[in-house]
Design a protein with these regions (language model features):
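Extracytosolic ligand-binding ectodomains
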Residues: 1-205
């Protein structure tokens, strides 16, 4: 999923946003963030044919709350897009602080932003942020998706976040493996998991 998100994000920045200059701000203590940033950079450079298109790269650690130093440095390069794959709390704070500094670049992030808490932390500042995700709850894509959406809404009286769909699918994959293994023994279940084919979950096949 990370290679897909990184390359799609880069393609969107280049093809749809017509970005010429991109800055990266990474959660350097998070392998997810570092990996996603690398996939994005590699693909954007490939598309643009210009290694200098990545005008700045800044790092921070999980739990940081003040990003003024990184953002002040980024601002001087006037990027069109800032790719900021990280946890939703830090990412929302980054965007808020960027707007306070007068940075107008479009922000792109990964699926960790696809949660209501991102909007709660970021408020109006995160409006217009671009998010890649593996699940959309507006239109069911198959019967499993339809059943999941109905059950979640009936139980919790709200829309499900993408992570809930992923957890639901993980449960279904294991349940399917147990049935095919006809056993509760871990080794047999593991073997059945490796043989899973054409699984249709709420987030797709």
């Amino acid at each position: 999923l990370d290679p897909f998100q990184g390359t799609v994000g880069a393609a969107y920045a280049f093809n749809e946003l017509k970005a010429k200059k991109v800055a990266i701000i990474r959660e350097v203590s998070n392998d997810y963030s570092v990996g996603l940033a690398k996939f994005f950079v590699d693909h954007f450079v490939k598309l643009s044919g210009d290694e200098k298109a990545i005008v700045a790269t800044a790092d921070y650690n999980t739990g940081d709350q003040d990003f003024s130093a990184q953002l002040t440095n980024i601002k001087q390069f006037e990027p069109d897009v800032i790719f900021a794959p990280g946890n939703y709390t830090e990412s929302a704070l980054i965007i808020k602080q960027a707007r306070d500094l007068g940075i107008t670049a479009k922000f792109i992030g990964g699926d960790t932003w696809d949660i209501n808490a991102f909007l709660e932390v970021g408020g109006a500042a995160v409006e217009g942020a671009i998010v890649s995700t593996f699940f959309a709850n507006d239109v069911p894509i198959n019967k499993t998706s339809e059943a999941f959406l109905k059950s979640f809404r009936d139980e919790y009286k709200k829309e499900p976040p993408a992570v809930a769909a992923l957890g639901y699918d993980a449960y279904l994959v294991v349940l399917d493996a147990i049935k095919r293994a006809n056993s509760a023994e871990p080794e047999k279940i593991r073997e059945a998991l490796t043989q899973t084919k054409d699984f249709e979950g709420s987030a797709g096949s």
